[in-house]
């Protein structure tokens, strides 16, 4: 925790104003204490709530904490482990780490390889847990979130987040890619790109 505090106190961090750590990447390992999965930094190692410690450190310096979720790509991320000899089961039960391990989508477009309702319900619960436990001011979603099967759950997540923010009397933002959200309901993100000219809206 000393290292986290000293990093957050550095001039480099202070000049950034926003700190948005990865809360969960495609591998399904949560960098925070969770009641949903045992595969998290608090239980498995380093036995610390990384997001929680970082929140305390950056907010003590007057900075803003956000979190990013890459969970949706876990739908297929582990599947390549089935292609060679590994500890990856061929037909994983619904466990905390390997499930669901579906094959890579063929085109990674908005309709190919769509995640199941069961998986999206799990995604939504994880997102709400992050919102409730850490009150992030920014909620960033990575690529493939534009998947058509995700759209109803994105609406539910946004409604939950914005309603919670109203209860906290805080302004918050959702960052998204492609057409995951209807324009004007969240903040579009252009990764490794730029607009052709100045725009009158946040991006």
Regions found by a protein language model. Give the residues of each.
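The substrate-binding groove and active-site-proximal loops of carbohydrate-active enzymes
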Residues: 1, 33-49, 106-121, 140-152
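Single conserved hydrophobic/aromatic residue that forms the stacking wall/gate
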Residues: 2-9, 13
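Conserved, mostly hydrophobic/aromatic
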Residues: 11, 58, 139
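Proline-aspartate-enriched helix->loop->beta-strand connector
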Residues: 16, 135-136
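Acidic/aromatic-lined carbohydrate-recognition and catalytic surfaces
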Residues: 17, 21-84
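Core domains of carbohydrate- and sulfate-ester-processing enzymes
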Residues: 57, 61, 66, 76-105, ...
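Aromatic-lined carbohydrate-recognition surfaces of secreted/lumenal glycan-active proteins
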Residues: 61-76, 140-144, 168-182
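Glycan-recognition surfaces
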Residues: 93-97, 101-102, 106-109, 113-121, ...
């Amino acid at each position: 925790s000393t290292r986290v505090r000293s990093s957050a106190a550095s001039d480099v961090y202070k000049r950034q104003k926003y700190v948005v750590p990865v809360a969960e990447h495609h591998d399904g390992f949560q960098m925070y204490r969770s009641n949903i999965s045992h595969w998290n930094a608090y239980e498995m190692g380093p036995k610390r709530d990384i997001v929680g410690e970082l929140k305390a450190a950056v907010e003590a310096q007057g900075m803003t904490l956000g979190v990013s979720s890459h969970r949706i790509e876990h739908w297929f991320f582990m599947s390549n482990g089935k292609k060679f000899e590994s500890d990856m089961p061929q037909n994983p039960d619904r466990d905390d780490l390997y499930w669901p391990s579906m094959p890579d989508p063929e085109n990674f477009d908005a309709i190919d390889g769509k995640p199941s309702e069961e998986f999206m319900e799990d995604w939504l619960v994880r997102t709400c847990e992050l919102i409730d436990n850490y009150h992030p001011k920014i909620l960033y979603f990575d690529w493939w979130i534009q998947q058509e099967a995700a759209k109803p759950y994105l609406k539910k997540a946004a409604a939950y987040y914005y309603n919670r923010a109203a209860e906290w009397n805080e302004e918050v933002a959702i960052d998204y890619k492609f057409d995951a959200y209807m324009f004007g309901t969240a903040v579009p993100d252009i990764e490794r790109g730029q607009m052709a000219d100045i725009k009158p809206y946040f991006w």
